[in-house]
Design a protein with these regions (language model features):
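Short coil/linker segments at helix-helix boundaries
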Residues: 1-4, 49-52, 57, 67, ...
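Helix-turn-helix repeat elements of alpha-solenoid scaffolds
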Residues: 2-13, 39-53, 82, 108-109, ...
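Solenoid-like repeat scaffolds
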Residues: 15-25, 52-63, 91-99, 117-123, ...
Length: 183
C-alpha cells in the first residue's frame, strides 16, 4: 500500500515535470517514467490517454524512448482487452526495433481465430508478415512460412521458422516413448 501511495505521488510529480520540461531528451524520459509508473499502478486508461495525447507523434524523443513508450502503450492496451491493437504494436516493435524484439515476442499473444482474422485485416503487408512470423514462432511455423511466402517469397526470415519447425520435430521424436528402449 505504501508503495502504491508513493507511486501515485511520484506520477503527479513526473507529470508536472513532463509538462514543464522544454528539453526533448528529458521530456521523453519523463514520459517514459510516467508510462511505466501508470502501468505498474494499473492505471492503464490514464496511460493510454496520455500516450495518445502527449507521446504518440513525438519524433524529437530518442528512438529508444519512442519505442519503449510504445511498448508500455501496447501493454496498457492489452490490459484494457484491446488485444488486436496491442498485438499490432508488438508486431511493429518486433519488426522495426531490434533491442526490444524479445520483449515484443514475449508480450505478443495469439488470438482466437475470429480476432486473428480481424487483426490481419487491420494490418498492412509488412505488419502481416511480422504477425505471421510471430504466429509461426508461437504456434505453427509451417503455417507461418506458408503465409509469409504468399506475401514475400524472397523473405529470409522464413528460415527462422524452418529452424523452429525442425526444433519441434526433434523435440517430438526425442520425447516419444516409442523411441526409448530398455537395456
Amino acid at each position: 500500500v505504501a508503495d502504491t501511495l508513493t507511486l501515485r505521488q511520484l506520477s503527479g510529480e513526473l507529470k508536472a515535470a513532463f509538462m514543464n520540461c522544454k528539453d526533448p531528451f528529458l521530456k521523453g524520459r519523463y514520459g517514459y517514467q510516467l508510462m511505466k509508473t501508470w502501468h505498474y499502478l494499473g492505471e492503464y486508461e490514464t496511460a493510454v490517454q496520455f500516450y495518445e495525447a502527449q507521446l504518440e507523434n513525438k519524433t524529437k524523443f530518442t528512438t529508444s524512448i519512442q519505442w519503449r513508450n510504445r511498448g508500455y502503450y501496447a501493454a496498457c492496451l492489452y490490459k484494457l482487452k484491446r488485444y488486436a491493437d496491442a498485438n499490432l504494436i508488438y508486431a511493429d516493435i518486433f519488426r522495426l526495433y531490434a533491442p526490444q524484439r524479445l520483449d515484443a515476442y514475449v508480450s505478443f499473444h495469439p488470438l482466437e481465430e475470429s480476432d486473428w482474422t480481424q487483426l490481419l485485416a487491420k494490418a498492412d503487408k509488412e505488419q502481416q508478415r511480422s504477425l505471421w512470423m510471430l504466429y509461426g514462432l508461437y504456434n505453427d511455423p509451417l503455417k507461418g512460412i506458408e503465409e509469409i511466402f504468399k506475401l514475400d517469397p524472397t523473405n529470409t526470415e522464413m528460415e527462422l521458422l524452418l529452424v523452429r519447425a525442425v526444433n519441434i520435430a526433434e523435440f517430438n521424436i526425442i520425447n516419444n516413448p516409442v523411441y526409448y528402449w530398455e537395456e
